[in-house]
C-alpha cells in the first residue's frame, strides 16, 4: 500500500468539532493506526460544526446533505497546497497526496457522509466504508432531525441518500450492528435494498449483537482490518 494514497476522515458532524487543541484520544489512536497502514489521514471540520458562530452552525439547516459534502470535497482539493505549505513551514519532508485514491470512512453521521461521498462525489472519492449510516432521516430521532431539517417531508426526502443508490459507481462497504438502538440497521438495509434494485455492487457487513459502537476489542480490531483490506483492493 503506497503512502501516496489519501484517506479522508469525515468530521463535518453537526455540533461536533474534531479540530481542537486537545485531540480526542480515540480519534488520535484511529488516525495513527491508519497512518501506520500507509495513509495520509485528513480530518476537516465543515459547516455545521461548533466553534465558528451561529452563521456557520446554521449553514446546514434543511440542506446538510449538500453542504457537509461540499466542504469535504473542498478539503480534498485543498490538500496538496495544504501539505506543501505545512512542509515548507516545518521543514519536514511530507508525501504528496494521490487525489485519484482518496477514500472516506466514518461512523454514524460520518457513515452517512462516507456513503454520500461515493454516491454524489465519485470524482473526488474513490471508495468509502460507511459504518452505521443514517441513510433515511425519517428513521432517526426527531429531537435531532427537526433541529436541522425542520418538519417538511420533502426536506427529509431531499437529504436522504437512499434515492441516490442508482448513482453508485465506486466501491462501498456498509457496516451495521443488528442491535444498534441509535441508528437502526433498517437504515443500511434500506440503502442496500435500493442498491440491489439498481444493480449496484456493494459490500454489506452486518454485525450480530453489536450496538451503535462495538465495545468488543476483538471485533473493533477486525473491523479495522476488514476496512483496510477492502480499501487496499478498492484503491488499486
Label each PLM-derived region with a short phrase.
Residues 1-7:
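N-terminal cap/lid segment of alpha/beta-hydrolase-fold proteins
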Residues 7-17:
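Short beta-strand element of the alpha/beta-hydrolase
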Residues 10-11, 40, 127:
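Short, Asp-centered acidic motifs that coordinate Mg2+ and/or phosphate
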Residues 14, 22-23:
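Conserved HGGG/HGGXW glycine-rich cap/lid loop of the alpha/beta-hydrolase fold
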Residues 17-19, 109-110:
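Acidic helix/loop microenvironments that form the catalytic cleft of cell-wall polysaccharide enzymes
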Residues 18-21, 134-136:
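Active-site/binding-pocket entry motifs
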Residues 24-44:
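Short amphipathic alpha-helix adjacent to the substrate-entry channel of hydrolases
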Residues 30, 43-236:
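Active-site-proximal cap/loop segments of hydrolase catalytic domains
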Amino acid at each position: 500500500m503506497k503512502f501516496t494514497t489519501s484517506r479522508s476522515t469525515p468530521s463535518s458532524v453537526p455540533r461536533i468539532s474534531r479540530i481542537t487543541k486537545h485531540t480526542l484520544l480515540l480519534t488520535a489512536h484511529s488516525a495513527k493506526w491508519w497512518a501506520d497502514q500507509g495513509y495520509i489521514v485528513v480530518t476537516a471540520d465543515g459547516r455545521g460544526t461548533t466553534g465558528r458562530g451561529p452563521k456557520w452552525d446554521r449553514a446546514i439547516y434543511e440542506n446538510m446533505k449538500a453542504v457537509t459534502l461540499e466542504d469535504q470535497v473542498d478539503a480534498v482539493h485543498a490538500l496538496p497546497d495544504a501539505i506543501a505549505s505545512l512542509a515548507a513551514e516545518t521543514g519536514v519532508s511530507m508525501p504528496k497526496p494521490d487525489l485519484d485514491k482518496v477514500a472516506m470512512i466514518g461512523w454514524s453521521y460520518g457513515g452517512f457522509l462516507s456513503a454520500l461521498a461515493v454516491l454524489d462525489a465519485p470524482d473526488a472519492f474513490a471508495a468509502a466504508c460507511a459504518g452505521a449510516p443514517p441513510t433515511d432521516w425519517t428513521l432517526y430521532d426527531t429531537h435531532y432531525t427537526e433541529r436541522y431539517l425542520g418538519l417538511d417531508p420533502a426536506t427529509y426526502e431531499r437529504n436522504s441518500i437512499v434515492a441516490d443508490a442508482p448513482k453508485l459507481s465506486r466501491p462501498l462497504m456498509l457496516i451495521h450492528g443488528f442491535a444498534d438502538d441509535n441508528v437502526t440497521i433498517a437504515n443500511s438495509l434500506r440503502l442496500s435494498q435500493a442498491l440491489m434494485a439498481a444493480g449496484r455492487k456493494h459490500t454489506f457487513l452486518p454485525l450480530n449483537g453489536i450496538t451503535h459502537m462495538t465495545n468488543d476489542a476483538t471485533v473493533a480490531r477486525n473491523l479495522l482490518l476488514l476496512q483496510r483490506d477492502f480499501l487496499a483492493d478498492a484503491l488499486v
